[in-house]
């Protein structure tokens, strides 16, 4: 069925995946809190990323760098001087927009050009398109726009007791720079030889002009980033490797093949530090959106930090005896965006065979489902024995225990939150020590010994 964003958001709020931030005080624009099921889903996704990109990789190691860094870091990286978005205001509604996203939304949704990208356009080119197309503010309905101007995305705060320029620091806008400044520490302490990578998961902050689309674009967000260092000249080979690796990770976790596409950046769209970038985009209900950027950052970052810090970042190649600054490939994935993608991809409303009823179901891969199973006693009289099954399984998996309402309603509730297996403990279970296991997707039921449940679920959640 065609999915709409409102249905996904409504389910996410209703079933405890995501709540509006600070809701009892009227909320705070574009802030979201992950509820009990949302935090399990997101943690499972992060663990799946860490498992494949760090733990099981012969190349990569992990890091957890501080959010607050010496401000010189952001001078060296270019964020203080160049980290800007094109801003435009509608004079009638007084609402501010990112000019490039305003144009993209119009061209993709109104003109039907799904592949239109505004990145790389100059301010004059963007203003010309807005004027020539007569793009209107969706709130006021007018085309009464200001000129386009720059807007710095860094969140500024102060360290210490006085709020002056000497104590000015910033919330990091990306996790990558924490990796670059620790490059030598990691390389030396772990005795790593090229090629190798450093990955981390952490919060970043960007004062976005027009955040929106639920958790797709927020000012506080979490990144899963890998900086992979290689010999200059080998960067395109490794970029292709990580493109394939990242795409396979998504498909293996259940994302549908026709829901994603790979899009190479045009030359005029590339960031100043990149000689090649490919985005893995997902087809959200609101249109195609960037999910994963795989960029060849060349030696830009290490060169900049070498120049600003005075440290030598050259690598001594033991095979060729050469010294050079490594090139870097960066696969950067937004944890919140990919969580939204998994929610959208899993969401379905479908008819029930042999019935006029419909059910809402989240078809999560078992590896990322918030609960791997739910134990359901057929009657509350059986709860004392059924809880023993729950306790046995919860030693290895996240498991729900639900004894309220009819068994049919409990099945539907578990379908809505994406639980792959419902385990019904009935009166026969007292005698034969077997339970009925219901599959979420097929709704088929099989009888199984309680002693085999651990092995059964372990096999199903393997990734």
UniProtKB/Swiss-Prot annotation:
Substrate binds at residues 98, 174, 221-225, 330-334. Its EC number is 6.1.1.14. It catalyses: tRNA(Gly) + glycine + ATP = glycyl-tRNA(Gly) + AMP + diphosphate. Its main location: cytoplasm. ATP binds at residues 206-208, 216-221, 290-291, 334-337. It is found in: Cytoplasm. It is an enzyme of class 6 (ligase). One of its GO terms (molecular function) is transferase activity. GO terms for biological process: glycyl-tRNA aminoacylation. It holds the Pfam family HGTP_anticodon. Signal peptide: none annotated. It comes from the Bacteria. NCBIfam families: glyS_dimeric (TIGR00389), PRK04173.1 (NF003211). Homodimer. Belongs to the class-II aminoacyl-tRNA synthetase family. Catalyzes the attachment of glycine to tRNA(Gly). This is Glycine--tRNA ligase.
């Amino acid at each position: 069925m065609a999915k709409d964003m409102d249905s996904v958001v409504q389910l996410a709020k209703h079933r405890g995946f995501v709540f509006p931030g600070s809701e009892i005080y009227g909320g705070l624009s574009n802030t979201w809190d992950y509820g009990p099921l949302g935090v399990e889903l997101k943690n499972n996704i992060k663990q799946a990323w860490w498992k494949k990109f760090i733990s099981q990789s012969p190349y990569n190691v992990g890091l957890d760098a501080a959010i607050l860094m010496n401000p010189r870091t952001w001078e060296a990286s270019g964020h203080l001087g160049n980290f800007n978005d094109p801003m435009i205001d509608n004079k009638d509604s007084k609402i501010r927009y990112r000019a490039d996203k305003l144009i993209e939304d119009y061209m993709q949704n109104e003109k039907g050009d799904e592949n239109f990208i505004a990145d790389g356009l100059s301010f004059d080119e963007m203003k010309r398109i807005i004027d020539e197309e007569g793009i209107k503010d969706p709130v006021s309905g007018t085309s009464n726009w200001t000129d386009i101007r720059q807007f710095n995305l860094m969140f500024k705060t102060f360290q210490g007791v006085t709020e002056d320029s000497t104590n000015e620091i910033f919330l990091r806008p990306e996790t990558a720079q924490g990796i670059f400044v620790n490059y030598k520490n990691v390389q030396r302490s772990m005795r790593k030889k090229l090629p190798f990578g450093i990955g981390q998961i952490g919060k970043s902050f960007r004062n976005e002009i027009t955040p929106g689309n639920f958790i797709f674009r927020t000012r506080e967000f979490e990144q899963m980033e890998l900086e992979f260092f290689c010999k200059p000249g080998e960067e395109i080979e490794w970029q292709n490797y990580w493109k394939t690796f990242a795409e396979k990770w998504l498909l293996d976790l259940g994302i549908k093949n026709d829901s994603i596409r790979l899009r190479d950046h045009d030359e005029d769209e590339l960031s100043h530090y990149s000689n090649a970038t490919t985005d893995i985009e997902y087809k959200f209900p609101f249109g195609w959106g960037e999910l994963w950027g795989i960029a060849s950052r060349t030696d830009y970052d290490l060169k900049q930090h070498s120049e600003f810090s005075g440290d030598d970042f050259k690598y001594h190649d033991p095979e060729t005896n050469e010294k050079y600054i490594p090139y870097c490939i960066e696969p950067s994935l937004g944890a919140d965006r990919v969580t939204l993608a998994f929610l959208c991809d899993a969401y379905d409303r479908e008819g029930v065979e042999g019935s006029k009823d419909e059910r809402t179901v989240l078809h999560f891969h078992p590896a990322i489902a918030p609960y791997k199973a739910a134990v359901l006693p057929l009657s509350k009289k059986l709860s004392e024995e059924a809880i023993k099954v729950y306790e046995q399984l919860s030693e290895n998996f996240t498991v729900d225990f639900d004894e309220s309402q009819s068994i049919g309603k409990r099945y539907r509730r578990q379908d809505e939150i994406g639980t792959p297996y419902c385990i019904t403990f009935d009166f026969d279970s007292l005698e034969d020590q077997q339970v009925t296991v219901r599959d979420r997707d097929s709704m088929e039921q099989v009888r199984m010994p309680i002693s085999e449940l651990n092995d059964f679920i372990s096999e199903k959640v393997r990734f």
